[in-house]
Amino acid sequence: MRALPVAAGLISEGERILVTRRKKGASYGLFWEFPGGKIENEEEPRQALQRELKEELGIRVEVRDLFEVVFYNEDTCPVLLLVFRCRIEEGIPEPRGVHELRWVKPEEIAGLRMPPADHPIQKRLSRQGARSWPERS
């Protein structure tokens, strides 16, 4: 089975990083995650992430370096998660396509209920704290 390609962004503000909460009724409904979404056919990962963040949060971002690649063998469909550091270029994040959003500190990230594909990123960020945070906006 082919893996589902997904792009996510790490967006920071000071010592906090942006997380979003999935809508109720969605897969992993009301779980927290790093904002992003599926990469459509023929779409480049960075373009997909820019599109998803515009749709879901109303922001335009500069997609920077690749922070982490995670493969998670989900029961229903394997997931290939590409996580990029991002910087907001325009707009203020609003929960347009998500249940809610929150800016969290390093010590808070480990306590969030996240989908399994996000666990390696969650652990890395909480373990390394602000040292591994994305470049400041």
Language model regions located:
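Conserved hydrophobic "DFG−1" position in protein kinase catalytic cores
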Residues: 11-12, 19, 86-88, 103
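NUDIX/MutT-family hydrolases
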Residues: 85, 94-125
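Short secondary-structure junctions
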Residues: 56-63
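Conserved N-terminal beta-strand and adjoining loop/helix that marks the start
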Residues: 1-17, 38, 69
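Generic C-terminal helix-cap and adjacent flexible tail
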Residues: 1, 126-137
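Active-site-adjacent beta-strand/loop module that shapes the phosphate/pyrophosphate-binding cleft
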Residues: 60, 70-93, 102
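Conserved Nudix-box catalytic region and its N-terminal flanking loop in Nudix hydrolases
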Residues: 16-55
